[in-house]
Amino acid sequence: MSEVDVVILAAGKGSRMKDDLSKPLHKVAGLPMLEWICRAVRKFNPKNIIAVQGADEDFSSYVDETVVQKEQLGSADALRCAFPKIDAEKLIVINADMPLMTENDLVDLVEKGEGFDAALLTADLKKPFGYGRVIPVGERNVVEQIVEERDATADQKKLHLVNAGVYLFRADYIKRAINNVTTDNSQSEYYLTDALPGAKIVQVADWHDILGVNTQQQLAAVSKIARKRINDQIMANGVTMIDPLTTYIDANVLVGTGTIIKPGTVIEHDSVIGAENEIGPYAHLREKTVTGIDVHIGNFVETKNAKIGDHTHIGHLTYVGDAEVGQAVNIGAGTIFVNYDGKNKHMTKVGDRAFIGSNSKLVAPVEIASEAITAAGSTITDNVDQHAMGIARQRQTNKSDFWQRMPHEDFATEYDAKHDQRDDQP
């Protein structure tokens, strides 16, 4: 494959999202859309990834180079802004709001575009509204014209072959051809599609890959597709999901073979789940949760930045945050790892085979040694040594005849009287 630069068009204002976050930074399955694009293109080792951004944006942490489009004058003008950074023989141009685009789509574009000055990805859509229509030259697989939705005639709107917004160009060709692009359209903008007559048409295998995001509803739709793809891949690797439709796993999560994931589970980015785990139902494994082999994380358990050793059981109603938990530990229901002092987060360490009693509160920084115990209901603020039991609660006192002092006595008397009357009825 020839050297290729990638230009990501990311300068659009994204006003239809109706929020203050830059559109390319909206997340799909835990990753910004811009990162999805970068992950796809990096797989074929481009020479440079260049983002064209607005004056108020900074995408430098995602790409190799950035350039600013000072005015929104159209896609051709955006690409022109990137010309000083282009050094390779060919370039791929792609919009920043296409998180479902795959490496295979881009490789197919490069391979089938060989020998052409330009090529573009297309899809055959049953409902093409909103997309530019691709008009081919007769039966040939090359472009005669691309017409944007707002500029199309009634007959052109009936066409189903649409422009995906992903292009391959010979650099020398597009640097010449872009000078012939005019603003003779309804938007008075420089359309990059006007430089595509004669371009090779390359159709994607899965039309979902070309879906773009302009609204919150579209963001939700592509997120649903992305999560299904993630779940399908995880299940293909030997993981059981009781209900994939209610299992939400981010893109950069690893799950080991033989693990069972129950409904309502959420597993967030940078987490690694070991083999033979049982997760859920209704478990929330937040970022940087790492589990060993044969770990059980049950219903209504939340973890974050936690390393959990082999054979450990965290059954229910527990928060484990900023923690290192050893092997074969039992953490009872209602346990809270108290990790935040109002300013800083602190670590809790629990050694192998420790037993944490129900409703314990471990106030970090604190360490529970191997084979140590905390008594149920304790608030542990000091380290507990090996083989010791930490108890931090007041001894129980029973006060006799206390019921009669409470208002419950009158209520109970009235309740009993009413039920006695019902029992007397035939």
UniProtKB/Swiss-Prot annotation:
Biological process annotations from GO: cell morphogenesis; cell wall organization; lipid A biosynthetic process; peptidoglycan biosynthetic process; regulation of cell shape; UDP-N-acetylglucosamine biosynthetic process
Binding-site positions, UDP-N-acetyl-alpha-D-glucosamine: 9-12, 23, 69, 132, 148, 163, 214, 286, 304, 319, 330
Region (Linker) residue spans: 217-237
Location(s) in or outside the cell: Cytoplasm
Alphabetical keyword list: Acyltransferase, Cell shape, Cell wall biogenesis/degradation, Cytoplasm, Magnesium, Metal-binding, Multifunctional enzyme, Nucleotidyltransferase, Peptidoglycan synthesis, Repeat, Transferase
Annotated region described as N-acetyltransferase, given as residue ranges: 238-426
Catalyzed reactions: alpha-D-glucosamine 1-phosphate + acetyl-CoA = N-acetyl-alpha-D-glucosamine 1-phosphate + CoA + H(+); N-acetyl-alpha-D-glucosamine 1-phosphate + UTP + H(+) = UDP-N-acetyl-alpha-D-glucosamine + diphosphate
Active site: 316
Keyword Nucleotide-binding attached: no
Cofactor dependency: Mg(2+)
Known EC number: 2.7.7.23, 2.3.1.157
Pathways per UniProt: Nucleotide-sugar biosynthesis; UDP-N-acetyl-alpha-D-glucosamine biosynthesis; N-acetyl-alpha-D-glucosamine 1-phosphate from alpha-D-glucosamine 6-phosphate (route II): step 2/2; Nucleotide-sugar biosynthesis; UDP-N-acetyl-alpha-D-glucosamine biosynthesis; UDP-N-acetyl-alpha-D-glucosamine from N-acetyl-alpha-D-glucosamine 1-phosphate: step 1/1; Bacterial outer membrane biogenesis; LPS lipid A biosynthesis
Residues engaged in binding Mg(2+): 97, 214
Residues that coordinate or bind acetyl-CoA: 333, 339-340, 358, 376, 393
Entry's cofactor comment: Binds 1 Mg(2+) ion per subunit.
InterPro entries named in the record: Bifunctional_GlmU, GlmU-like, Hexapep, MobA-like_NTP_Trfase, Nucleotide-diphossugar_trans, Trimer_LpxA-like_sf
Family: In the N-terminal section; belongs to the N-acetylglucosamine-1-phosphate uridyltransferase family. In the C-terminal section; belongs to the transferase hexapeptide repeat family.
HAMAP family: GlmU
Oligomeric form and interacting partners: Homotrimer.
Function: Catalyzes the last two sequential reactions in the de novo biosynthetic pathway for UDP-N-acetylglucosamine (UDP-GlcNAc). The C-terminal domain catalyzes the transfer of acetyl group from acetyl coenzyme A to glucosamine-1-phosphate (GlcN-1-P) to produce N-acetylglucosamine-1-phosphate (GlcNAc-1-P), which is converted into UDP-GlcNAc by the transfer of uridine 5-monophosphate (from uridine 5-triphosphate), a reaction catalyzed by the N-terminal domain.
Protein name: Bifunctional protein GlmU
Phylogenetic lineage: Bacteria, Bacillati, Bacillota, Bacilli, Lactobacillales
